[in-house]
Every structure is written in structure tokens, then in C-alpha cells.
């Protein structure tokens, strides 16, 4: 039986109006994956007999977006010869960042779209920095709107140099830079004859070569809990996605911060594991599972708890502890000062946190300190801060278990900042 092709999740990033949606639209259009609802609309409007034009599809997609309906993300899947690709999101969604951090959909790669006309713009930098903060390892650069610069090689090389400088500064290496015109369909799926000077991959060929995501099986077991069910005749069944490590039937797991909150170990033996209603002996990273735990009641645990082995339990940050984090402020109406208390979203947990100290302001591009102990930080700033949770929460330093070290800061219905945990300081 042929081994299944690897599944790869990608996000599209880049400055507003540089052509992210058009590029996604072109990929779907040229691979025959236009969302159902668009095709339906086409038929309803009696457009039969007319050809199903790309421009028409893009207008419909744009209308849907303006009405606040983003095309159902589940539809944005397509295949390349060696990969199943899911486009999990594109910025512009209000919850883009939160989804990328807390969603079940950690991106494996990002496509950075840069217009040949403008070159690197402020949001290009912000999104690239964000990709790094969110731990996206692979980047593909699409230099779009080549039709607007007459497919000029010199202009392509100029913009390519700008992007390379930015990404190398952020620590990215070995990324393809592809000249495309999403609107004209050049070098997206079909190889372009307008740019004979370019002999690298098309966008879809580059997507086909994204390295297969590694499964972090050697890290300690961590399963953030999404829900807890009580099933007659079975018992308590927590449900969650294995982020790291592996879980076998018969092992003993402990739940945190539940154990810390109740001042007693909330733990038990795993009697069974199920995935998609099939029994499993062993669960691996990426598996969405339900598992039955002996001696743990439904009221002991809840969404936001994390299961781990008793030999290496999840790390709890208590209310007397603090943690040091690197954040990037994405969207704050005024400025963040010490004492600010928004909500932290990490894995499946949500807890209020307080900004205890602003240690340093960083240059978002280089990560170098530009100001020690700033009075405030505002939109666009990167900073090192000390945060204190107002309720116990499981967090891990990003160097140790990155899946549990990234977080979003939310307030007033929007994502204020994204960040990663550098270290945890124990209070007495």
C-alpha cells in the first residue's frame, strides 16, 4: 500500500494589497479547487455558457470577504504530487494570530507575498517577524505583480535582495524566491514563458518540496485538553491533541494545573485510547484522541489542563510565579504599560495575566535591544516583558517545548500581541 502523502499546513503572509488572496485564488483555480459556494453562485446567476473566468471568481471571493464571510477554510485544500496542502489561514482574519498560535493548526510553512511594485513594506517585516515568533520554520517568497513591472528581471533582483536581507536577519536560510503574476497565472501553477531568465520552481513546485513536518516524539508527553466527557460504562474521557511525546495504554498521566489547584495529584492509569472511534495502543504527536483515565472524575479536569507523564509532568506557572517572554505588539489602541491585565491564550488555556515589568524594547527586525526598561510599548514594537498569570497555567519555555511556549494576548475582542515564553521564574 503506498504511504500516504504528508499533510502540510501553510499560511499566506505579506503586506496588505500585495496579492495574498489573488495568489490563493489562483492556486485553487488552476488546481480545480474553487470553493463549492462560488461555483453554486456562478450557476445561480445563469452564467452558464460563459467561461468561468478567474476575474469573476476573484470578485466573488472579494464580495464574500467584504461581507465578513471568509471562504470556509476547510475548502482550501489541494494536492501536489507529493503533498496534501491545507491553507489554514491568511492575515486579515481578525483572529489570524490567535488561530495560528492556539489553533490545532500550527503552520509548517509560510508563503510570503511581496509586490514587485512596492517591494518590502512595513507589514512585510511585521508578518515575517511574526512567522519567526510563531516558530514557522520554512518560508517561500512569491514576488507578485511581475506583470505590473513588465516581467523585468532587474526589478525582481532588487526586491529579491530586500527580502533576502530581511529574512536572513530573522534567521531564515534556503528559501526559494519566485517571480509570479497571480492575476495572469504566471509561475503559480503553470510555468511562465514571460520570464525566460528565471529557471527556478513555480510556486506549486516549491510547495511540493516543503519538508515533511517532524513529529516531536522524543519530547515529554503533553496533551492540552480540549474537552472532558463522562461516558456511561467507561468513565472520564478527556479529549485533546497530542502535541509532543507519545502516550501508551497502561501509562499513568497527571493533569496540570488541576493538581496544583486541588493540592493533590489528579492522576490515573490510561485504560484505553481512541482516535476517530478506533482503539489505539499508542498515540503520537498530531493525533486527536480521547483517552479514558482510571480514578479521575469529570469535575477534576477541564479545558486548558494539560496531561503529561507523572515522571515528567507539565510545567505550571503559579500566581506567585512570573515568566519572561518576548512579544510583538500587533494591535493596541494606545500603549501597554506595567499593570495592564489582558487575557493570555496558550494551547487550549485562557487565563488573565498582568504585565509586571517591561524589560526592553527590541528592533523587530534584528532582535537587538533599542531601549532598556521602556515606560510603554505600542503597536509594532517587539519587547521582552515579565508577565504574571492571575490563575495557574501550564506553559513551557519555547526552547524546550515550543508547542506550549507560544501564546496570544487578547483584549477587547482582538489579538493585542503574540509571544513566546523565554523562562519561568519561581516566586516564594
From Swiss-Prot:
Region (G2): 68-72
SUPFAM superfamilies: EF-Tu/eEF-1alpha/eIF2-gamma C-terminal domain, P-loop containing nucleoside triphosphate hydrolases, Translation proteins
Gene3D superfamilies listed in its UniProt record: P-loop containing nucleotide triphosphate hydrolases, Translation factors
Recorded GO CC terms: cytoplasm
Location of region: G1: 14-21
Key word Nucleotide-binding present: yes
Tagged with keyword Phosphoprotein: no
Compartments (UniProt record): Cytoplasm
Start and end residues of each tr-type G domain: 5-217
A Pfam entry, by short name: GTP-eEF1A_C
GO MF annotation, one: translation elongation factor activity
Disulfide bonds: none
Region (G3): 89-92
Function per UniProt: GTP hydrolase that promotes the GTP-dependent binding of aminoacyl-tRNA to the A-site of ribosomes during protein biosynthesis.
Family indicated by similarity: Belongs to the TRAFAC class translation factor GTPase superfamily. Classic translation factor GTPase family. EF-Tu/EF-1A subfamily.
The protein's name in its UniProt record: Elongation factor 1-alpha
